Amino acid sequence: MLLFDASILSLLVLVPISVVVFCLSLLIGHFLSEPLSDLAKKTAAYRNGADIPFEPDGRMLEADRLTVDFKQLVQTTKQQQHDLAIKEQRQKEFISDVAHELRTPLTAIRGNAEMLTDPDLPPSLHDKFCDIIVNESERLSRLTHDLLTLQRIENSPIPEEMQRVNLRELASNVVDALHPILQDRQANTLVTGEAPDVLGNPDSLRQAITNLVENASRFIQPGGHITVELAGVNGNSVVAVKDDGCGFGDVDPKLLFDRFYRTDASRTRGTGGTGLGLAIVKSIAEAHDGTVEALNLPEGGACFMIAIPSIPADISEKKVTRK
């Protein structure tokens, strides 16, 4: 009898406990699975294209950590998609610009070549058409070279070899190398000032300064002046190329560094440029974490500047050179 009563008592105790344990198991299981289930639903919705916010709700530490990881992954993916879209748009614009710019010299070459087939063409016109073909061929060669240079810089924005560069020495070398061209255009050129050394690719920086000096030489009058000024400003080494030409009027200075931008439809072709020189300067500056700027001078003429972060004075030579 006592054994039977003990069994009944055990059942009366175990049954409620079992019910409580079962209910607690369901509650805990729901507490554990619901955050994971919500995260799974958000992930599925995001995979289908929905813009779902991934924010931790504090219900479960592990789920919150996983949510934060997913949030970072989503942000990284969105940034990569954005960067890819920008790159694709630039490629489309580049191809469109190339097609447009190549059409002009090719049309001129073909048209004048067809005129040369005329057996009754006077000798004077024959020489004229030949000169046009030669000039347009040279322009086409320069354009192709600049296109390849710009594309190389934009596709590989970080210079392959970075080393200490003395901009004053580099600017002087550029002016010396351009002496025949500057002399032909009767340009009076002066290099002045000093700037702290920078960490950069010497060939790329030489190209940038060359383009700025050549650009200035195209828009000065015979006997005009070009000044290459160097200075250290707010932690940057600045190269400013000034001329006493006609300036660029009311044009937005930022537009001057766009590919193929011209303030005058015939201006660049008439001066032998390709419309890519300043765009190359901008790309080189940005590849060195630098900036470009253009402004009209109060006394007349224009100033084009490139600013590159200076090497701090306390940095040793061993820490400067990088490949």
Task: Mark where each language-model region is.
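A conserved beta-strand-to-alpha-helix junction within the catalytic ATP-binding
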Residues: 60, 161-176
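Short alpha-helical segment of the dimerization/phosphotransfer core of two-component systems
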Residues: 135-140
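C-terminal end segment of the histidine kinase catalytic
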Residues: 286-323
